[in-house]
Amino acid sequence: MTRKAEAERNDEALLRAAREVLAVDGAHASVAAIAARAGVGIGSLYRRYRTKEELFQHLCVLALDDYLRAAEEGLADEDPWEGLAHYIRTAIEIGPGSLAPLAGLIEVTDEMADKNSRSDEAVTALVERAHRAGVLRADVTMVDLALLIEQLAKSPLLDQLGRQGRADLVESAREARARINAIALDGLRATAAHPLPGEPPSYELFSERWER
């Protein structure tokens, strides 16, 4: 294996480990725990990322790239509902809930802000298109969707089974999670019976926790 290939493999392992440790330990995830889970030395981590914050910032950039790609794929679907549903399902799998603990604890870089803005614009376009087509309930906003996705991306059952090493139950838990997601999606349809309580959440409610 060439040095370049080994470096790429180590980086992939570090990013995967960082996501996993972050999901369990939150923003207090230690560099040592991340390196150990990745099976590399701490020196390898610091050769790639000068600080833990830089590693977490890179994770956020990668996730924002994934959200933008999912939204653009949704917009490419001519069916307003299916396009929106594709974005929601894909965003849930990306797992924004695991990055939420970083809010307010790391500096938002210009790259993060730019990618977030582009992603927000694409998702807003999905929501507006679905509203115009009459397939998305009129009282659902882009912020509602962002908060819903963050909640659905968390799976305490899957996390617990993973910690217990219950590989025999993981697939059933994934199927159960897919059912819950489908129930939530149906609740977004314009045919939903009951109005939502309270006022729509502001964009600041969702975004200001990232300010330091």
Task: Provide a role label for each language-model segment.
Residues 58, 65-97, 107-122:
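Hydrophobic alpha-helical connector segments
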Residues 39-49:
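Short hydrophobic/aromatic patch on the recognition helix
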Residues 1-37, 54:
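Basic, helix-initiating cap at the start of DNA-binding domains
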Residues 22, 30-31, 42, 52, ...:
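Amphipathic alpha-helical segments enriched in hydrophobic/aromatic and basic residues
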Residues 101-110, 199-202:
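Short linear capping/connector segments at secondary-structure termini
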Residues 117, 121, 125-133, 161-212:
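C-terminal peripheral helix-coil segments that are non-catalytic and often amphipathic
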Residues 26-27, 47, 137:
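Helix-turn-helix/winged-helix DNA-binding modules
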Residues 86, 107-158, 169-178:
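Amphipathic alpha-helical packing segments from all-alpha helical-bundle domains
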